């Protein structure tokens, strides 16, 4: 019997709220969820349900994240909101909640603040592709010119970090007043309240401006090798979970990482001891390859569509260093530190050549709990790409989490 598919008629998009503490991220999340509850299958989430987010573990790090779902006429959204600033940093770097786009919440009464800047920088570094801005607390600003001034400041900040500041949609409103009105009148529609309308306007902008992401199955094929064995008379099988794309018997693929890249043909696909013609993203499969010895493939290599990914040894990454309480180091580390970089399925030793602070200055050392940009040099080439997540390990325990922000060589 065929596996039951999760049916959904609307395209799905993952978004999240980012911005400075107390500018209204969680209130906005609650307001959107409550205003759209009438159109959505699920009930709206209250502020305190979102604010007391449960702890999750991603790559060995504890993160508090709230997940909210809602629908517009056009799409289904999964929305992530984090209670604390440290949770944002950890969430964005580990990719625990992937974002196809973000809502930058900035208080119109205060203007951009340090974390506004930091979250924009982080969004750039970890590859959040699109941002829409909500200028919150607009009810506290009587002067239209002041509102325009804040909008200009935020635009400049976005442009500074290579987001298209002048194209990004801005909506000014009051999340709190919209939330209070919507709670009092759950089936409120458009045109009934000016603050609730700003929430509808924001969602219209998100529907229009944040593109529907390419589905995992439509991307180029990639599978990280977890195990290898040989079947007498048939050849070598590499097993793993297909990360993206799809693959068929007869396809040409490349074996990448740790050694010279090799090209081969798929002669068979197996899942749960049954052979298949094709396999898709998310499937755990065994891939039988032609003319390859068992000794030619090892854990840590990837099988991928030809030309889609290349091996590298040097990259820049945005890294969060775990605190002692999180099981990380008790002491700082310095340039020249040689940990293991755990990428996809394997550890590769590398040296940290330099640390760079947010302002571009070189840092000598990094303390547990810091976030820093670093340049790493691996001893073996492996398949790496921008946006890929990795862990930094030392003697088998995770001491840092990172994301590749730039390939150097």
Curated annotation (Swiss-Prot):
G1 as annotated region, ranges: 19-26
Keywords in alphabetical order: Chloroplast, Elongation factor, GTP-binding, Hydrolase, Magnesium, Metal-binding, Nucleotide-binding, Plastid, Protein biosynthesis
InterPro entries in the record: EF-Tu_GTP-bd (IPR041709), EF-Tu_GTPase (IPR050055), EFTu-like_2 (IPR004161), EFTU_2 (IPR033720), G_TR_CS (IPR031157), P-loop_NTPase (IPR027417), Small_GTP-bd (IPR005225), T_Tr_GTP-bd_dom (IPR000795)
Coiled coil stretches, renumbered: none
Keyword Nucleotide-binding: yes
Primary site of residence: plastid
Domain tr-type G: from-to ranges: 10-214
Enzyme class: hydrolase
Single GO molecular function: translation elongation factor activity
Region listing for G2, in residue ranges: 60-64
One Gene Ontology cellular component: chloroplast
Residues annotated for GTP binding in this entry: 19-26, 81-85, 136-139
EC numbers, comma separated: 3.6.5.3
Cited SUPFAM superfamilies: EF-Tu/eEF-1alpha/eIF2-gamma C-terminal domain (SSF50465), P-loop containing nucleoside triphosphate hydrolases (SSF52540), Translation proteins (SSF50447)
Region annotation (G3) ranges: 81-84
Catalytic reaction equation(s): GTP + H2O = GDP + phosphate + H(+)
Annotated binding of Mg(2+), by residue: 26
CDD domains membership: EF_Tu, EFTU_II, EFTU_III
Chain intervals for the UniProt region annotation (G5): 174-176
Region ranges (G4): 136-139
Subcellular location: Plastid, Chloroplast
Function: GTP hydrolase that promotes the GTP-dependent binding of aminoacyl-tRNA to the A-site of ribosomes during protein biosynthesis.
Record family assignment: Belongs to the TRAFAC class translation factor GTPase superfamily. Classic translation factor GTPase family. EF-Tu/EF-1A subfamily.
Entries under PANTHER family matching the protein: ELONGATION FACTOR TU, MITOCHONDRIAL (PTHR43721:SF22), ELONGATION FACTOR TU-RELATED (PTHR43721)
Protein name according to UniProt: Elongation factor Tu, chloroplastic
This protein's encoding gene: tufA
